[in-house]
Regions:
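Aromatic (Trp/Tyr/Phe) and Gly/Pro-enriched flexible surface segments
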Residues: 2-129, 150-163, 167-233
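Short amphipathic, basic-aromatic surface patches that mediate peripheral association
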Residues: 132-148
Length: 233
């Protein structure tokens, strides 16, 4: 078992989204700096200084100004800043606002969201606690044979404890590879190895005005597994 059995919770680097810098990304001509949710700019960062990333890139508009994840403020947040996620559409693709632990790279107009970071657990997590606000709308743009084409455009928050040899890359942009998509609620392992546990919530209603508390209990596929020691956990 994870030991000790109970503690006050492990600290997630920059979980409050207080520290931001920039990341250089190519655009149609040249490059541009996009918001990067870590204290040290991407080109200089190492280790936990590169804990978070998003799909921010230079192709979202011709000017490269529309971003999927930005530093913001909102009533009810803890601290001075938070992250704002917003869906954006450009000539090449439509992309959801996103933020995750891992890395994001572009190869031309194709993007790869690479999920996974090294993380050391001092106890078996019971849940992930967070605050959020959301403005949910109707689906009004459909492309690439989506699983749902009508109704509300739900938000999704999930956390995973994994034992992976490598990051798992999801391919999107002008070329989508559905075989790279994954959902910890429906699979307990990927090519990179096993998913030990997960917590998940769908956001189906708008909640504005002030941030709301949310707790994601961890559901364990492996109820007695020791702390993961893989390259990405």
């Amino acid at each position: 078992e994870f030991m000790p059995k109970n503690n006050n919770g492990d600290i997630i680097p920059n979980a409050g989204m207080e520290s931001w810098s920039t990341k250089s990304m190519k655009k149609i001509i040249g490059s541009t700096n996009v918001p990067y949710p870590n204290a040290v700019k991407y080109e200089d960062a190492t280790g936990t200084d590169k804990f978070w990333d998003s799909g921010n890139n230079g192709y979202m508009t011709s000017s490269g100004t529309d971003k999927l994840c930005t530093q913001a403020t909102y009533p009810g947040m803890v601290g001075d800043y938070c992250a704002q996620l917003a869906a954006k559409y450009a000539v090449i693709a439509f992309a959801a606002g996103n933020l995750y632990t891992g890395d994001f790279v572009m190869d031309g107009t194709v993007g790869y969201a690479q999920f996974g970071q090294p993380y050391t657990y001092s106890a078996r997590p019971a849940a992930l606690k967070l605050k959020y606000a959301a403005e949910i709308g109707e689906i009004n743009r459909v492309k690439n044979d989506p699983p749902v084409s009508t109704g509300i455009d739900k938000g999704r928050i999930f956390v995973c404890i994994v034992e992976w040899s490598d990051r798992h890359a999801v391919q999107s942009g002008t070329s989508v590879d559905k075989t790279t998509f994954w959902d910890p609620e429906t699979v307990s392992s990927l090519n990179e190895s096993k998913i030990i546990g997960y917590g998940s919530a769908y956001i189906t209603e708008s909640h504005t005005g002030s941030m709301k508390d949310l707790e994601l209990p961890i559901v364990y596929y492996e109820k007695t597994a020791p702390p993961p020691t893989g390259n990405y956990t």
